[in-house]
Amino acid sequence: RVCESQSHGFKGACTGDHNCALVCRNEGFSGGNCRGFRRRCFCTLKC
């Protein structure tokens, strides 16, 4: 199962999954991607 949480450290519009994933890894997650109408960065973690 994969859990998701919105990134606390990512600032601005999420335009690229790569940058989002890097920020998420710094927050202790396994990765992340941009999602939603407002293009927010969501971090993923196996749970």
UniProtKB/Swiss-Prot annotation:
Keywords: Antimicrobial, Disulfide bond, Fungicide, Plant defense. The keyword Disulfide bond applies. The record marks K11 as: Interaction with trypsin. Pfam families: Gamma-thionin (PF00304). SUPFAM superfamilies: Scorpion toxin-like (SSF57095). GO terms for biological process: defense response to fungus; killing of cells of another organism. The keyword Ribonucleoprotein does not apply. Disulfide bonds join C3-C47, C14-C34, C20-C41, C24-C43. Inhibits trypsin but not chymotrypsin. Monomer and homodimer. Belongs to the DEFL family. Protease inhibitor I18 (RTI/MTI-2) subfamily. This is Defensin-like protein 1. It comes from Vigna unguiculata.
